[in-house]
Amino acid sequence: MPVITLQYDDLEKLTGTDKETIIKRAPMIGADIERVEEESIDIEFFPDRPDLYSVEGAARAMRGFLDLETGLSKYEIKPPKVSISVSEKILRIRPFLGCAVVRGIKFTSSSIKSLMDLQEDLHWGLGRNRKKVSIGVHDLSNVKPPFRYMAVDPGFKFVPLDYTEKMSMTEILEKHPKGTRFAHLVRGFKKYPIILDSDDNVLSFPPIINGTLTSVTESTTDLFIDVTGLGEAVYTALNIVVTALAERGGQIEFVKVVRPDSGELILPDLEPKTRFLTKTEVRDLLGMELSIEEIVKQLERMRFGAKALDEETIEVKVPAYRADILHNYDLVEDIAKGYGYENIKVKIPETYTPGKSHPISLLRAPVNEIMVGLGYYEVMPFTLTSEKINFENMRRQKTDDVTYVLHPISEDQTMIRTTLLPNLLEILALNQHRELPQKIFEFGEVVNNEITGQHVAAVSIHPQANFTEIYEVVDALMREMMLPYEVKESEDPAFLEGRRADVYVNGKKLGVFGEFHPEVINNFALGYAVVGFELDLNDLIGQS
């Protein structure tokens, strides 16, 4: 979780209160205090509240909690003077774009650092290390609109941030620190994303690096903000950044985004989303009776717009910068925070309900211990994936046992995974900048025919990775679990013929292991030999 350093003088100015009150009340808005210094406080905010990843966002929330300023924050937005066109070709590479202009900002070195920290924390919290969301912040005075978001050849040259000489985009990916770190995000594409002004000056090579021309300094007053990505989280990130800048006195200005697929968009869209909450929902979840007036009061303390429609129903306006409100339960949680958990009376349960470990946990613990003992690190990736990752990249045929997401919000999360190995290979692809060998495993859930199963899988990448290495790992795991097994020749297309095997226990196939096929390695843009295994452990659950 991100740890944000907040300067007292900045926070006191933005909240209108003193540092003693800040230290005392900060945990109540959803944070843990990590460190208290003479001039600053380090606060760890929960990952579901990216709107608190800046001093401006934290101050906005704290003003409400302290009853200094309650209800929905309102931001004036000026008509658009800047436009940006989106090319057809970029839609196949990085299709989502959100933009805004913020004028009249007075920067200091600390406020610039705060903005850059917010940018990087959002890359982590919303962007999955820039894959889903990447943010560019530019000095608008050094470029000339209208702008263009397009795809260009890898040989295109410009001067990247912190450099003085022109480099081709290929050279940036090979030599620039940011390029080598994030090259995997554009690897495999024949053209790369770029944002240009009307004179062909480079603003950004998203999601890698900005051009040096638009660097933000203390003399900067007007900003152009671009957010690119793979889904609608782009717009949430844009809203968080522009409202944070508005809290510091900036004037938000619309930008006209001209798309080839959906026409014109006028961004940012700061219109709040409307939800309807009932008094009964609050009572049933909190276990206590609150009046309709009290519920409205606590929602406004948490910076929602709230209005009682009758004695049972409240209309709630959710700020456009809140990424965490997915259900009415999230509203009730904020009501509890506003009311104060310390004010909720303790009630001892009337029935005695002793707990015990779940059978899955009883199997997970020894398996994890064995894998860690074999030198593997545990990872816990997402269970949502795509057909491309789950099947195409693995050279496997699509099956009929897939559970699909009805309304996916991004192209890389359209189904629930049926196997663990593709996720592990994705993680290796994201960590190519780290030392080899890399050995990771997961004990996790897969879903086939809408039935949840438990699998364990592991992969190892380094130049000498081979069949014998992974065979020894599988053998050690099976021996430690005291499972007699046999291996037979496999036909799994994800692995090399002659260097793959199926695992059988009591005549039933349990899994597969071997050396991955070069095509699979290339599909995940991995540069070294990779071996792996995956075992279905469902039949072992509940066994002593």
Curated annotation (Swiss-Prot):
Tetramer of two alpha and two beta subunits. The gene is pheT. This is Phenylalanine--tRNA ligase beta subunit. One of its GO terms (biological process) is phenylalanyl-tRNA aminoacylation. It comes from Methanosarcina barkeri (strain Fusaro / DSM 804). Belongs to the phenylalanyl-tRNA synthetase beta subunit family. Type 2 subfamily. The keyword Magnesium applies. Its cofactor is Mg(2+). Pfam families: B3_4, B5, tRNA_synthFbeta. InterPro entries: aa-tRNA-synth_II/BPL/LPL (IPR045864), B3/B4_tRNA-bd (IPR005146), DNA-bd_dom_put_sf (IPR009061), Phe-tRNA-ligase_IIc_bsu (IPR045060), Phe-tRNA-synth_IIc_bsu_arc_euk (IPR004531), Phe-tRNA_synthase-like_B3/B4 (IPR020825), Phe_tRNA_ligase_beta2_arc (IPR022918), PheRS_beta_core (IPR041616). Mg(2+) binds at residues 324, 330, 333-334. Keywords: Aminoacyl-tRNA synthetase, ATP-binding, Cytoplasm, Ligase, Magnesium, Metal-binding, Nucleotide-binding, Protein biosynthesis. GO terms for cellular component: phenylalanine-tRNA ligase complex. It comes from the Archaea. It is an enzyme of class 6 (ligase).
